[in-house]
């Protein structure tokens, strides 16, 4: 009996707990200027979150500039970088869903490469999921402060229209930048609908 107990104790001491992984999905269309800056910032956050593993999934959505070559160069120097490249532009929704299917993380984030989504928010979003029990945490733009008058009116009308034709309440100002648990990602990927509206699914 004592021998068995010693073996169990030895296993506990000697074994390492597997780190949780966050997959960062980054849809890219003609982002040659912003990609190096984004990569530098997001890898800084990854270094700060030492207890978590990361993978960075860049989706080249038929870019006409040097985006794909930059992604390939990042892949050569960082094995955490993975990518999908489309021969033509399928739109952001298509890129996001391709990334969701490709991601292997326990948590999955979607964010833009243009730095409108602060990479530093990943830490706070992860904390909210881990400590406060949320399944999905999203960033919102407060009252569209940076929008011009025409865009503000259009945006308001858009949300009213979607609210009328959808049974799911829409959150005005909700962005695509969000962090989700694996079970949320799996539920979305398992949906078979061809035309999916991401903000409606995430609401």
Per-region residue spans from a language model:
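Residue-level signature of catalytic and energy-coupling elements of molecular machines
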Residues: 24, 42, 99, 114, ...
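N-proximal low-complexity "stem/linker" segments adjacent to membrane-targeting elements
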Residues: 5-44, 51
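Short helix-capping segments at alpha-helix termini
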Residues: 46-52, 75-80
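Acidic helix N-cap motif at the loop->helix transition within catalytic regions
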Residues: 33-37, 65-74
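Short beta-strand/loop segment that forms part of the nucleotide-sugar
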Residues: 26, 50-62, 84-85
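Acceptor/aglycone-binding surface of glycosyltransferases and processive sugar-polymer synthases
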Residues: 80, 86-88, 92-102, 107, ...
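A conserved acidic beta->alpha catalytic loop
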Residues: 60-68, 115-116
């Amino acid at each position: 009996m004592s021998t068995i107990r010693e073996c169990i104790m030895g296993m506990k001491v000697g074994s390492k707990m597997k780190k949780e992984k966050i997959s960062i999905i980054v849809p890219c269309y003609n982002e040659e200027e912003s990609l190096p800056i984004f990569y530098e910032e997001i890898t800084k956050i990854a270094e700060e979150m030492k207890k978590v593993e990361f993978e960075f999934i860049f989706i080249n959505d038929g870019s006409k500039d040097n985006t794909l070559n930059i992604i390939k160069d990042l892949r050569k120097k960082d094995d955490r970088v993975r990518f999908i490249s489309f021969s033509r532009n399928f739109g952001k929704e298509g890129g996001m869903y391709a990334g969701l299917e490709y991601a292997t993380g326990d948590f999955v984030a979607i964010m833009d490469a243009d730095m409108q989504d602060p990479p530093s928010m990943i830490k706070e979003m992860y904390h909210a999921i881990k400590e406060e029990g949320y399944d999905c945490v999203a960033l919102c733009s407060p009252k569209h402060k940076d929008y011009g008058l025409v865009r503000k009116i259009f945006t308001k009308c858009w949300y009213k229209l979607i609210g009328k034709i959808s049974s799911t309440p829409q959150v005005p100002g909700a962005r695509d930048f969000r962090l989700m648990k694996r079970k949320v990602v799996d539920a979305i990927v398992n949906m078979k609908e061809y035309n999916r509206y991401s903000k409606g699914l995430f609401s």
